[in-house]
Regions:
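C-terminal subregion of chymotrypsin/trypsin-like serine protease catalytic domains
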Residues: 56, 272-323
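Conserved active-site neighborhood of the chymotrypsin/trypsin-like protease fold
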Residues: 99, 126-127, 133, 144-226, ...
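Sec-dependent N-terminal signal peptides
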Residues: 2-31
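N-terminal activation segment of mature serine protease catalytic domains
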Residues: 36-139, 187, 310-323
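Terminal peptide-recognition signature
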Residues: 119-121, 140, 147, 151, ...
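Extracytoplasmic
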Residues: 105-106, 113-120, 133-138, 144-146, ...
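Sec/Tat-exported extracytoplasmic proteins
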Residues: 68, 72, 114-118, 122-125, ...
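Flexible, gly/ser-rich surface segments that form the specificity/activation loops bordering the active-site cleft
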Residues: 133-135, 154-160, 200-254, 262-266, ...
Length: 323
């Protein structure tokens, strides 16, 4: 749901092991008790154990579609028209408490800790437009265990092109969206509510300085059928800049530029610091070309909004003055 850029993820590893065992057997004789013990079979290489962790994006997409079809059969769901109307109302909300950031962690530990708090937001597209994707996916993250979700405002507005929408956690639970609690189209942030009471929330930090290491967990599209995304992809980078920019006709706003990669399908994903706390939210990409034909890509800006744009929607407004 963000603008796209050409990118490639590839990874490979190779493992090898060799075991040479020699034994001398004397005809009609057994080996003496003092002989060296038999060689212990080597343990499986680390790569072999990791094979079980490989996941099929196709199966995840199928799971999402199946759960969404079941969700569509439920009665009393809030209509997409109403959700879009709430997003356009540009309101704020009050959140009583947010989780505290924990200790500093390495990349693998951050992924393990934060992944359960990242969600897939998506829906099935309306109509039968030629070459149109059947399913459309975006990203989001939990900030309260009772079902408060953060994503982009443009993700919510995009619901109007879908028949049914839902939010799925990494363990395959599907939830309907019951309300848009708050939204800010200028900063492209929306706060959603889903029917849940045992989700894994991510802490939200105040800020991150330029040069700080950051991570992104999102669902970028793959160069395969459109219903396949690289669900729960982890990328790493740094905060490369903090700018006041005019974007999309809005007055200057705060932009957190990062080098952690993301692409279409990553909209609404968290930008995390080394404590696993949210310091920004993915919004868009901006490719820079070296020629008028836009063929020579020189670099791609990754623009997110700082966490302050999220916190601004969660702070309670001062009470109105009494007459």
């Amino acid at each position: 749901m963000t603008s796209t850029s050409k990118w490639l993820l590839a990874g490979a590893w190779a493992t090898g092991a060799g075991v040479v065992l020699m034994a001398c057997l004397l005809a009609g004789k057994t080996a003496p008790s003092s002989a060296a013990p038999a060689a212990v079979p080597p343990k499986p290489a680390a790569g072999a154990a990791a094979e079980e962790q490989f996941q099929s994006p196709e199966e995840t997409a199928k799971k999402f579609k199946a759960e969404l079809d079941r969700l569509a059969e439920r009665k009393g769901l809030v209509s997409i028209v109403e959700l879009v109307r709430q997003a356009e109302a540009q309101k704020t909300t009050t959140i009583e408490t947010l989780p505290d950031p924990g200790q500093k962690l390495a990349g693998a530990a951050i992924y393990a800790k934060a992944r359960p708090g990242v969600v897939i937001i998506g829906g099935n597209a309306k109509g039968k437009r030629r070459r149109a994707p059947e399913m459309i996916f975006g990203s989001g993250f939990v900030i309260r265990k009772d079902g408060v979700i953060v994503t982009n405002c443009h993700v919510v507005i995009g619901f109007q092109d879908m028949k049914t929408v839902g939010v799925m956690t990494d363990d395959g639970r599907m939830f309907p969206i019951t309300a848009v609690l708050a939204a800010d189209s200028r900063n492209d942030v929306a706060i959603l509510k889903v029917e849940a009471d045992n989700l894994t929330p991510l802490p939200v930090a105040e800020s991150a300085p330029v040069g700080a290491k950051v991570y992104c967990i999102s669902h970028p599209a793959l160069n395969t059928p459109e219903t396949e995304n690289g669900f729960y992809t982890l990328t790493e980078g740094v905060v490369s800049g903090k700018f006041r920019l005019r974007l999309h006709g809005f007055p200057p706003l705060n932009v957190l530029a990062v080098t952690a990669d993301y692409a279409k399908g990553s909209s609404g994903a968290p930008i995390l610091n080394e404590h696993g706390a949210v310091v920004g939210i993915v919004c868009e990409t901006l490719p820079l070309y070296g020629d008028a034909q836009e063929q020579d890509v020189q670099m791609v800006w990754k623009f997110s909004r700082p966490s302050s744009s999220i916190l601004a929607l969660l702070r309670e407004k001062p009470p109105a003055a009494k007459p």
